[in-house]
C-alpha cells in the first residue's frame, strides 16, 4: 500500500479532557507508524495545551492552533502569532460584550482564573492542571501576550454577535453546534486565512506528500476545513452532523475502538 499521512484531531477524536487517550488509540497509532505511514496531530489546541496524554502518542509531527503552528520531530517549523495589540483588543472586546477570553499561544495560555472558572466550563480547572507552568494570567500581561488564537466562552446575556462584528476583521470564526461537553459554549477565533486544512496543505507541500494520500479523523466543526480538503475522511461516532455528512466512513467513538477500527477499515493497520 502507498504511504499515507493520517491527520488526527485531538478532543473528541483521540483524547478526552477527563479520561485522556485510550490505550487502543495509542496502540493503533503505533501500528500505523510501524506500517510505514505518518501520523500527525491536527488540533485546534495551541501547542502550549498539548499535555502529557497527547505527548505520549508517537506522532510524526503536530499541527496546532488550527494550522497556526507546525512542528516535526520536536522542531517548530512555523508559528503564526497575532500582534500583542490585537491580542489586547480581543480581550477588551470580548469582555465588553460579556464573553470570557481564553488566549491561546504556542508557549503559554492566558486567562484569569477568577473569570474562567468551572462554572463557565466544567473542565476549566483541568485545563489549568494540564497546563502547569504554561498558564499565565491575562491580568498583568495585557500588553505582551503571545497568542495564535482566542477562544470566546459565551455566558448568559452575552452579545456574541456584537463582539464578532468587531473581531471578524482579524479572525476567522468557528462556531460549534449543540452543547457538547467540550466545545458547546465556545466560539473559536483563528487568524484570518488559517485553519486545519491550511496546516495540512503546508505539511504535504513541505514534505512532498501527495494530496491523494491524505487521511483525516475528526469529530467537531473545527474539523470542517480539513474534511472539505482531505482525500479520505473518517468521522468519529460522536461527530457533528456536518462532519458525518462529509465523511467517507463513520467509525465508532474513541472509547469503543474508533481509531483502531477506522484505521483497520482503511487497511492501514
PLM feature segments, named:
Residues 18-124:
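Active-site phosphate-binding/coordination module
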Residues 59-66, 174-176, 233-237, 251-252:
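Short hydrophobic/aromatic-enriched beta-strand-loop microsegments
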Residues 10-11:
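Residue immediately C-terminal to the conserved phosphorylatable aspartate in receiver
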Residues 57-58, 66, 169-171, 229-230, ...:
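Short, structured coil segments at secondary-structure junctions
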Residues 1-3, 36, 59, 98, ...:
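A general structural motif
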Residues 1-5, 22, 186-269:
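Mg2+-dependent phosphoryl-transfer enzymes with acidic/Ser/Thr/Gly-rich catalytic loops
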Residues 99, 104-217, 221:
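Conserved acidic, metal-coordinating active-site core of Asp-based
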